[in-house]
A protein has these predicted regions:
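Intrinsically disordered, low-complexity activation-like regions
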Residues: 1-63, 68-79, 83-185
Length: 185
């Protein structure tokens, strides 16, 4: 039996980009969350422990590790603070990939997810970098989402929709914002 770290990164990419319809990427489905937890829970734990370092030798392997940390965390731990716990790890991997120009070896569809940790960050400096990355990518819809994320961080310095889950007290302005359409992703 292979260990989680021996699982080939291609299985992650095949699942995310071939098995799943793109409409499932940004939705919320208990069935998908359960599937990801069942199929990839062990690999997720290996990623959290830093055991997938061998994947980083190839741009696609690094992307797979980012998807596991950034996207699968949100599925496996939906409605839990743990959904965001690996964001820092995923961001560092994405920053290293971009510094090494590894993103140039990925398809546009793959680059969307390589850049996603930037969009998920609560740092305005990182959000500014996110805008540059998504603008250069040239996919208008993704750029609009990056801009919406940026604008929330520019206004509040954090994502108000995470406050309750993370035990943070919301300001009056944040509470009013949370009543607006499009205040959560």
């Amino acid at each position: 039996m292979e260990s989680p770290s021996d699982m080939h990164y291609r299985s992650i990419l095949e699942f995310w980009f071939a098995e799943l319809p793109s409409s499932a990427w940004f939705g919320s489905s208990a069935e998908l969350d359960s599937t990801i937890a069942r199929r990839f829970g062990d690999i997720h734990q290996a990623a959290l422990a830093g055991e997938l370092y061998s994947w980083r030798h190839k741009p696609q392997g690094r992307l797979a590790e980012i998807i596991v940390l950034d996207q699968f965390s949100r599925n496996i731990y939906r409605d839990s603070p743990r959904a965001y716990a690996a964001d820092g790890q995923a961001l560092v991997l994405a920053q290293e990939a971009i510094r090494a120009h590894a993103d140039s070896e990925l398809t546009d569809e793959q680059r969307i997810f390589l850049y996603m940790p930037y969009m998920h960050s609560e740092s305005l400096a990182i959000q500014n970098a996110s805008l540059r990355l998504y603008e250069a990518l040239g996919l208008e819809n993704n750029y609009r989402f990056a801009l919406a994320h940026h604008d929330i961080i520019a206004r509040f310095g954090r994502y108000p929709h995470r406050n309750t889950l993370l035990g943070r007290v919301s300001s009056e302005e944040e509470l009013a914002f949370l009543q607006e359409a499009g205040s959560s992703f």
